[in-house]
């Protein structure tokens, strides 16, 4: 079983390296799709993978995500954003769960980090991010969601992946 990380980015040079350093600790195929960065995002990405592609932004997050998935070599896709950092993955348990649930969508635990009035807060949520490449896709121009390719309903399961999300933090 091969797992690919699919990531879309734009002007993420400040976040991307931290995310990729953690991803590179695992044997994943990494695909990064740049949707029009004007900073050094692409240069940072190329330090970690040769699978960096340009995509002309068309105001549709699902299309960009699906393009990234189309470039992935793995049978399974794990979607991670540039402002998310892997805190933990139980690889052995993950492989077992994927094999048992290959027609379902895996829900990772995302810990959103943010500050307000000098105080730090976190908010935990489960998000659909792990799925079989040939069974699922993204739909929705904004607030894109994982959908079954034939638009059938699907079940989910929790996977042993924890991501810290720093996108709500002020730089």
Predicted feature residues:
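Acidic helix N-cap motif at the loop->helix transition within catalytic regions
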Residues: 14-18, 39-48, 89
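Catalytic-site signature of metal-activated, phosphate-bearing donor transferases
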Residues: 62-69, 80, 86-171
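Conserved donor nucleotide-binding strand/loop of the catalytic core
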Residues: 42-71
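Short, well-formed alpha-helical segments that are part of the catalytic scaffolds
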Residues: 6-26
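A conserved acidic beta->alpha catalytic loop
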Residues: 22, 34-44, 57, 81, ...
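Short beta-strand/loop segment that forms part of the nucleotide-sugar
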Residues: 7, 28-36, 53, 82
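Extreme N-terminal starter segment of soluble prokaryotic enzymes
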Residues: 1-4
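Short aromatic/hydrophobic "clamp" motif used to bind/position activated sugar donors
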Residues: 77
